[in-house]
Amino acid sequence: MNAKNWPIVKVTLPADLKGIKPGEVPEFLLRDVKPHGKLHWLAADAYHAMRDKAFADGIKPFKPISEGDTYRSLAFQTTIFLQRYQKSPLAGASTRTWEGVKWYKKSPTLASLAAPGTSMHNLGIAVDIWSAYGPRFEWMLANALDFGFSWEVVPEEPWHLRYTAGDNIPAAVQAWLDRKKVV
C-alpha cells in the first residue's frame, strides 16, 4: 500500500492528560490491555473494541507483543533508547536529538525510537500491533480510524497506531461499550 493512502490524523489528547508529563501518567488513568501492557483508559477501550472487531473478522492474533508496545514510563523509554542509540557518530546512521544532543542509531536493523519524553507511548495513547503486514495490516488500514486510531510514522512503522480521538469516543467504540453493558 502506498504511504500516501495511510490515514495520519492529528492527535487530540484526552483532557485528563493535559499537564501530565510524558512517561509519568498516573496509574489511575491507565487500564490493562490484553495480552500485555496498559493504555490510557480511553485508548484501552478503543483498543479492546478494535481487537474484538478484528477477532470477529478472523484477524487473529491481534495484539501487542510485549508491555513495551503500549504505555512506557520515562525510565523504560530511556532504557530502550540507550540500547538503540549512541552519542558517537556513525556514518549513515539515522539520528534523534535528545536533551540537545544528537544520538545515532546503532544499527539500521533496529526499529527507530522516539527520544524519551516525546513518544506517544509515554502518554499511553500508542500501541504497536504484532505482525502488522498482509491481511492484518489491510484490516487495520480499513478499520483503525473507526476506532479512533491513526498512524504516526509511515511506512517505517506500520504496526504503530496512536489514539487520536481525545475525549470524543468514536461510534464503533461506543457501540462496543454499549454491548458490554448489556451483557
Residue ranges of predicted features:
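Cell-envelope/glycan interface and biosynthesis
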Residues: 1-183
